[in-house]
Amino acid sequence: MQTTKDVTFEKVSLKDAVAIAKKGTHCGMCRIDFLGTGLCPSGKKHGYLAYWPQGRMELVKHLYEGRIKPTEKLLEIANSCTLCGICDKQCNFTTQLRPEKVARAIKNYVNTLDQSELQSVPEDDILRGLREIVGDKWATNDPNIVVSYTRSIIPPDTELNKYYIVMPESTEQVSKIIKFANKHNIPFMARSGGTTCSVTASYVLIKAFSLDHGVVIDLLRLKKLEIHPESSTATVGAGVTTFELQKAAYAHKLRALVAEAGAHYCSNIATTGIISTWGNTYGAFADNFVDITQVDEKGIITKHSDVGILNPYAAETGFANVTMTPSKIITEAIVKLHPVFDDEVAVFVPFTHLKDALSMLLKLGKRDVGLSLAVLSAKYLAEFLSPTLQISRDFEYICKNYLKLNWVVSVIGTKDDQKIVEELAECTMDQPLMKSLILGAPRFSALKDSEFLRILSEEDDPLKALFAGPMRKHLEKSLDPSPEQVAKMYDTDLQGFFKKVYSKPEMTDVAWLHAFRILPTRMLRQRMFSGPGGSIWTGDMDHILNWIQMFADVGDKYQLEHSLGFITPLDHGNFVYMEYDYFFDHNDPEHGHKIGKTFIETMEQSYVMGKVITLLDYLFKGTYRKEHVLYPIPEGISKEEQIMFKELLESTLGSEDTW
């Protein structure tokens, strides 16, 4: 059965495609135009995840394993791909994968099929009812589409004939879907970007962040996006990503509080209140919005601005009030935007010791210096700046072993902020140097065993010698930074494209990169990571450091690659939020088991230590006032309460022996 007439393309087997697909981590970057390539034509037209590169990863795995049978929709999925190469450019930038080969393999597979091999998918009363709400095109129970939602809301190894996928385009349709599902006693769950679901798909939290049967409400079509410069606000639908909002806001010299580029903004508000390095200045939780429209579990539509509703901003705190499922679906929000200043600059302060970096961060945070503030680990810095995983590892090795650069305090602010930082710091890394490191990352990593670094490492203070002394100019000269140099690290056929990408000013503008957040997905290069953490009161430095060390000890206990990710101040420096990252092979069940243990153990120990608002306390409290989530500052729990905590987890996640 021919898929595309008169087109000859490279033959790729399902087996070869699966080798690529297994490395995919569902970061969602293929659904935003972050490199100026445009969007996948197939995904943009058809909507369902199966038509996007991300969804084809799951589709090809199930076809190869014989777990699904081909249907007419598989032909449409195969034919709709134009082999335009957009996905290769996007995915190679972030994860070094080539997903177009997966699409080619599906086309090759379909070409071997006979019409008689196509399975029919019966339409039942539930599907007919859903189609009456959204139209025939936007509701389906076809396994070839359903399978694409595996690992991003549907658990692996589950029966696909138990699901319906529906794509509403309005709040009213979401309400009708929920009422219809309730009428027929069918469970439902909304899906936005699916990143949180993807991260938890390999370990025990999947039981909380997935649907074992029922209706998946894919919110992608709720794409309303309006910028209101006169009030510095924006109206944002549930299908709008952070990148899309930020791009629209920047056209008016405005900025949204952001987390990750591919995250859907409304969902990001609901899930965690937007954890961001800009949060000390712009706020968190209910600070993010003026009003929201939401649909509850009964299908009732409300707004925060409705007169007479119960207090929508108050939250009960403590482990007994942890919730792992949202009680409402935010379908639209009016969110706050903030001015972009003409004199914004980036300045990094390098440190050897975490305590010194944290001390600098708190000084700046409590004085409200800077717009974006964070301590970043050398690992984070290396991952973000490096075009490949190997370069990032060499970059990190040089930072730690030659430069004694283990941490940087990252500051995005005005020139006035820069002056304050430079007065406090012995040495800094400015925008020109950061640009050189981005464009010279391959050459920098190649210095690993050089005489230059050996001599530098023998200095009493390598950081000061390099960044505040004459050796800086020698470093920059040796880097020979250029778009051509970075582009050569990519596959030959993509080098011309990436030379153009790295020639764009924004790709080396650290302030822009902080605002648009397109680099953090490099943490998901062909592997997964889990990032537990939380907020901690900043009144006791030793307590903070002991808390962070606890995460490191747990990582060592389970023999996982791990690193502190970032620390950022909140509430004028009264708190800091810390993310600690554990890296693992998402295809290895044993790794998934270890990750589940680390998550639960670190959360439990955080409750025991006290003065910590854990990530569990954050979940689905994003619409509340931050003061109601962060305060009162919690004391450590007792042994009796530890037992209660485990019982609570077992009621949601199953017995402890399954963790």
What are these regions (language model features)?
Residues K224-H228, V236-R367:
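FAD-binding subdomain of flavoenzyme oxidoreductases
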Residues Q2-K22, K44-G55, P156, L160, ...:
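Conserved glycine-rich FAD pyrophosphate-binding loop
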Residues I334, V345-T352, L361-K504:
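C-terminal cap/substrate-recognition region of VAO/PCMH-type FAD-linked oxidoreductases
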Residues Q2-A21, G36, G43-Q90, T94-V121:
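Ferredoxin-type iron-sulfur electron-transfer modules in oxidoreductases and energy-metabolism complexes
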Residues G129, D356-R393, H543-Q559, I595-M603:
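Short amphipathic alpha-helix segments
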Residues R151-R255, N268-T277:
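Long, structured ligand/cofactor-binding scaffold of large enzymes
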Residues W52, R128-I154:
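Conserved oxyanion/phosphate-binding beta-strand-loop segments in alpha/beta enzyme cores
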Residues H26-I32, L83-Q96, Y313-I334, P569-D571:
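Conserved phosphate/anionic-ligand binding catalytic regions in large, soluble enzymes, centered on
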